[in-house]
Amino acid sequence: MFVRQFSSRETEAELHLELVKLPVDRMQWGAEDWQFADLYMPDEPSPYEKDEGVPCVMLIHGGFWRKKFTLDLMAPIAEDLAEQGIAAWNIEFKGWEPEDEGVWMDTLSDVMRAWGQLALLPGIDIVRSMILGHSAGGHLALMMSSVAERKPWLTIAQAPIADIVAADHAKLSDGGDAVRRWMGCEPEGNEELWRRVNPIDNPPRTSVVLMHGKADEDVPWTQSESYARAMKAKGVEVQKVWLPGDHYSIIDVASDDWLTQVETIRDWL
């Protein structure tokens, strides 16, 4: 496969493709060094291919929105999907650093732009394209299910931070302050802002599957349960799948937890 580097100086209609031999297609779609994504395409004919192309899963990594965590976390999943005939679009985005004071808008903008870039790629069936996110990436996936102009075929949220206010009060993350560092403020006195970015306050406009390990100590499964209950109260049904593993087995391609997720993806194709 090859890397295709998109020049940020060109319009979307006039993309210049520079081919560089690498294991995956790395696409730099913006001017910032984090505005890129890796495209994994099946090497063999896909059993899921139609005239429009192959279905694709956009992957959003976790790490409590911190810059030090990268898309490498989702690379094994991307490789596994491609081996099974499903394209993967593994994205990077703006994460917060210790000196930052709120980057949530940049993060969401990057994710939305990456989703938009996917529609420009040849060989992709954009109608059957999905979004899958883990942990903080699960939060972003749920937000995309609510705000994305082009709705995903399916949204899978793996151990998602589905209620950022509850996550902040529970001091989730190593330092306990990751949510408010990403937001740039505390929830008290900024309720409307936090509601804008909180999945539990923004019902999805597409089908959602919640995948959560009952042994998860990093993001408790009650995050998914509370979200599902809140959506039901709003008249929105989401699917819940409780898994036996923890926060990391859910992204371990050698685990039974991952096999369950692959079966769900296949069921939608």
Regions found by a protein language model. Give the residues of each.
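Conserved alpha/beta-hydrolase "acid-adjacent" motif
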Residues: 217-223
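Short beta-strand/loop motif that positions the catalytic acidic residue
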Residues: 210-212, 216
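Primarily recognizes the serine-hydrolase "nucleophile elbow" in alpha/beta-hydrolase
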Residues: 113-172
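C-terminal catalytic histidine-bearing segment of alpha/beta-hydrolase fold enzymes
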Residues: 101, 225-269
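N-terminal cap/lid segment of alpha/beta-hydrolase-fold proteins
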Residues: 2-49
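Catalytic nucleophile-loop/oxyanion-hole region of alpha/beta-hydrolase
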Residues: 68-78, 89-127
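Mobile cap/lid helix-loop segments that gate and shape the active-site cleft of serine hydrolases
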Residues: 166-200
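Short, surface-exposed "cap/lid" segments of acyl-processing enzymes
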Residues: 46-52, 57-80
